[in-house]
Amino acid sequence: MLNKQTLISIEDALPGREQPMQIEDCHFVNQSSLTAPLAHHQQQILLGMGCFWGAERLFWQLDGVVSTSVGYAGGFTPNPTYEEVCTGKTGHTEVVRVVFDERVISLAQLLAVFWEKHDPTQGMRQGNDLGTQYRSAIYTYSQDQQEIADKSKLQYQQALEAELRSTITTEIVPAGPYYFAETYHQQYLAKNPDGYCGIGGTGVCFPPSLQG
């Protein structure tokens, strides 16, 4: 019997499919392209912080964020469906892909929001959402991003320890494939303002002097 709090092995993961998910390319909120190549002053990062509906809304509201989308990453099954991810048999976590203008907002500033707005100490869950798909994760696209993310984790761990909180369980590794979620998930809380939002932090602030 599958334990949804234990990551599945690649041997036991669902096979998936070759055909990518077909999505509407236009961002529902700011009309940006979800699939456009990065400009020279832009970066991307994948952030997992529980249910991706509420997480995405946090980031599209920030100055300097060019575009956001939601999808699946960190697992084994190619081009999974939401229903497959929910079984725990793909290895993926729900993530937000954030494309940002590094001239306006830094990765360190984005990560301060990431750390503060969810509980990164809960392992394979986030609040009432239970399963490996809700694990906390940062998937990076360069060595510089990896170093910034690792450093910010240490800084936030120190802030948590000062408040006698638990140990961070966030997975921080180089990004593998990113698979778009279905169109109805994209900018979900803009389309459904009264929809479910599971976002909730620890109440511990990231030290302002360290946000870069």
Curated annotation (Swiss-Prot):
Against InterPro entries, the record matches this protein to:
Met_Sox_Rdtase_MsrA_dom, Met_Sox_Rdtase_MsrA_sf, MsrA_MetSO_reductase
For this protein, what is the EC number? 1.8.4.11
Signal peptide range equals none
Q: Which GO terms describe its biological process?
A: cellular response to oxidative stress; protein modification process
Q: Provide this UniProt record's keywords sorted from A to Z.
A: Oxidoreductase
> Its GO CC terms?
cytoplasm
Supply the enzyme class, top level: oxidoreductase
Question: What is the top-level taxon of the source organism?
Answer: Bacteria
- Mind listing the GO molecular function terms for this protein? L-methionine-(S)-S-oxide reductase activity; peptide-methionine (S)-S-oxide reductase activity
Q: Which reaction does it catalyse?
A: L-methionyl-[protein] + [thioredoxin]-disulfide + H2O = L-methionyl-(S)-S-oxide-[protein] + [thioredoxin]-dithiol; [thioredoxin]-disulfide + L-methionine + H2O = L-methionine (S)-S-oxide + [thioredoxin]-dithiol
Q: Which residues form the active site?
A: C51
User: Mind telling me which residue stretches traverse the membrane in this protein?
Assistant: none
Please explain the role this protein plays, according to its UniProt record: Has an important function as a repair enzyme for proteins that have been inactivated by oxidation. Catalyzes the reversible oxidation-reduction of methionine sulfoxide in proteins to methionine.
- Family, as annotated: Belongs to the MsrA Met sulfoxide reductase family.
* Descriptive protein name: Peptide methionine sulfoxide reductase MsrA
